Swiss-Prot record:
Protein name in UniProt: Elongation factor Ts
Subcellular location: Cytoplasm
Keyword Cytoplasm in annotation: yes
Domain of life: Bacteria
BP terms from Gene Ontology: translational elongation
PROSITE patterns in alphabetical order: EF_TS_1, EF_TS_2
Annotated family: Belongs to the EF-Ts family.
GO MF, one example: translation elongation factor activity
Function per UniProt: Associates with the EF-Tu.GDP complex and induces the exchange of GDP to GTP. It remains bound to the aminoacyl-tRNA.EF-Tu.GTP complex up to the GTP hydrolysis stage on the ribosome.
Entry-linked InterPro entries: EF-Ts_dimer_sf, Transl_elong_EFTs/EF1B, Transl_elong_EFTs/EF1B_dimer, Transl_elong_Ts_CS, UBA-like_sf
Gene it is expressed from: tsf
Natural source organism: Xanthomonas campestris pv. campestris (strain ATCC 33913 / DSM 3586 / NCPPB 528 / LMG 568 / P 25)
Gene3D superfamilies with a match to the protein in the record: 1.10.286.20, DNA helicase RuvA subunit, C-terminal domain, Elongation factor Ts, dimerisation domain
Length: 292
């Protein structure tokens, strides 16, 4: 069967593979486009397997939202260079939108989610790996499904936040999401802080006190320690932090002034918790040139 340009074009549109790869797939499969697509998927998976042990610590946080339903996904690449590649960026958007329209609650469940093209996210991942030449990982997925006020915010593709408010408007929700992106509070309010953390901080503050202060009456000593602990708790809670969009008030004051309440939030940052491999510049250039 003759391998026409239109047949190659159709296979490229279906699979996202390169022109020469599509032509080879069609030749190998006697012009059968379905068999050629399957051949490309298998080829992509084989290439992906060879790269699976490489550390992927760069990447992008992508988001998708429809009303009170919102998701964040973290997709990792090996280098910042590929993290800016149009094929990679398009893939992260595909993953985010597929996640939004699925019931998946984690990255593992996302692998088998089918796209409009009929392929799974895992199969698309393998195809993109074949194009960009790096290990890619769909590492994390977080979502909020709520009838409340929900905002999704991504800063520079590196940090993403989902926040849920009861009450307030879209502007407030986005402002709170921006604050969380910037300040990374571990907890919403003081009652969320573990008692073990508070006890440990009290122990530390007491150990730091001078003998003169320790000799003060118990009630005075308790006030001093309580003041220090209150400051620490404010630093680790969203409500206790000065609001980045108006530092004259705390986040709690800003939220309550709008008659709202923060129900919860999720925050992802690219590569957090992944041990990166340090390489020299020459090695990085060689890798990008396909020489390493």
């Amino acid at each position: 069967m003759e391998i026409t340009a239109s047949l190659v074009k159709e296979l490229r549109e279906r699979t996202g593979a390169g022109m020469m790869e599509c032509k080879k797939a069609l030749v190998e499969n006697a012009g059968d486009i379905d068999a050629a697509a399957e051949w490309l998927r298998k080829s992509g998976l084989a290439k992906a397997d060879k790269k699976a042990d490489r550390v992927a610590a760069e990447g992008r946080i992508a988001t998708a939202q429809a009303g009170g339903k919102a998701v964040l996904v973290e997709v990792n690449s090996e280098t910042d260079f590929v993290a800016k590649d149009e094929n990679f960026l398009a893939f992260t958007d595909v993953v985010a939108n597929a996640a939004l329209n699925s019931d998946a609650t984690d990255a593992d469940a996302l692998k088998s989610v089918k796209l409009d093209s009929g392929e799974t996210i895992e199969e698309r991942r393998a195809a993109v790996i074949a194009k960009v030449g790096e290990n890619l990982q769909v590492r994390r997925l977080v979502r909020i499904d709520s009838a409340n006020n929900v905002a999704a915010y991504v800063h520079g593709g590196r940090i993403g936040v989902l926040v849920e408010l009861k009450g307030g408007d879209a502007e407030l929700a986005r402002g709170i999401a921006m604050h969380i992106a910037a300040m990374n509070p571990p907890h919403v309010k003081a009652s969320d802080v573990p008692a073990e953390f508070v006890a440990k901080e009290k122990e530390i503050e007491l150990a730091k006190m001078s003998e003169k202060d320790k000799a003060k009456p118990a009630e005075i000593l308790e006030k001093i320690i309580s003041g220090k602990i209150s400051k620490i708790v404010n630093e680790v809670t969203l409500y206790g932090q000065p609001y980045v969009l108006n530092t004259d008030q705390t986040v709690e004051q800003a939220v309550k002034a709008a008659g709202a309440e923060v129900i919860g939030f999720q925050r992802l940052a690219v590569g957090e918790g992944i041990e990166k491999v340090v390489e020299d510049y020459a090695a990085e250039v060689m890798k990008q040139a396909g020489l390493a």
